[in-house]
Amino acid sequence: DGTDFLFSPVSTRFPTGKKRTEDPIADLIVNDYESFVNSGALFSKNVALIKSYTNLTKEEQVGSDEVVAERFINHMVDNLLYIYDSVPESTRELSKQWYEGANKIVQRMADKHGISLAQASAVAANLSPQKDWYQNASLAERVMNIYHENINDSFDQNMKDKADVIYFNKDVKPPARITNREKLDLIQGKSLQQLIDEKVSPHVLGMWVRTWDQTYNSPNYRIVSPDGKFLEYAVNKDGKTRSRAGWGSLAEIGKALTAVMNPEIEVLSESLGDANKVRNFYNNIFDPASTLGFVTIDTHAVAAALIRPLGGKAEEVGANFGTQKGSSNSKVTGHRGTYSLYEEAYRRAAKEKGVLPREMQSITWEAVRGLFTSTYKAQKQNVTFVQGVWNQYNKGKLSLAEARKKINDHSGGVERPSWERSDFTI
């Protein structure tokens, strides 16, 4: 169809099944809500999950799948607009720039190492699961730096000692220790370049990079501003000690390395996998100006749409990613879980405010992190309180406005973002 794929985003659904009717590499598949509604049993199974959510009243939970899904989307749109309006305009003007800032940061990394923006964007996206952007940006920088600057370093005794601490500590279960030992045996004494030449699996390369990083780099990372500036170091809840960046899985690091090593869009697209969130995140970073409606639904995006203090293990979050028991995914269409419902809510809310869906997402993402801070979420009674408010709403004892006010008053309202409180830049 004449699309220039060198400057193209990637398909947001990645169907791989034999019966698929779309090719996510040859064509650009941009998920739309209609395709989700028309997905048959997949749609019904995912709507069955939301029929139990107390964000809907008992009356709203009853009805056909399409009707209940529509009510759920309308509820989320209402919540997102409420959060959007609760953020001062001066903050909104900055927080809507998150992906433009991410694009600048990733472009700087790409320029430094002579790789494409697409490669650097894929590195960041592949390292994004369960990470905030501050850590994510730091991890992406580490992978690119180590690959380009330390590729010929050999796996020395310092790294071996560090590997023993990382991969064989008391928290590592016996089966994982066995596979870790197998990987480590392949790595002993070798450089990253030697391992690449030996065509070892990306997981093994990931282990080498993580071990080098934890041996020779500081674990501290900086706060980032929405417009792409690095600010002071992130600190822990005590306000003094510096936070430490935590690596995700070796599979994720391996995928990031695959992206660093291969400029071909087919390889990059495949490295991103079938998670709708990771694929949208890549597009938002790679081309923040796109009008195709790409929107990254992560843990905080689900929390904002539902106005709930959710963590990565919450059922609603798992359902969004298609990892929660009872959620439904399809290799034939590439739909995963309830993602399409949230995506549609953000698109509709954005349209009402005349902003891009990714701008609606980053404004409300920042706000919900300030409404439910990590300190607030860490206390079980707070999570229980909010659950109780939605239970009352579900039973018709509170209006939506009353429920939101109760939650807002209890949490103390939206705390200003860390980058807005900072007067430090590098």
Model-derived regions: residue spans:
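HhH-family (HhH-GPD) DNA N-glycosylase catalytic core used in base-excision repair
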Residues: F5-I426
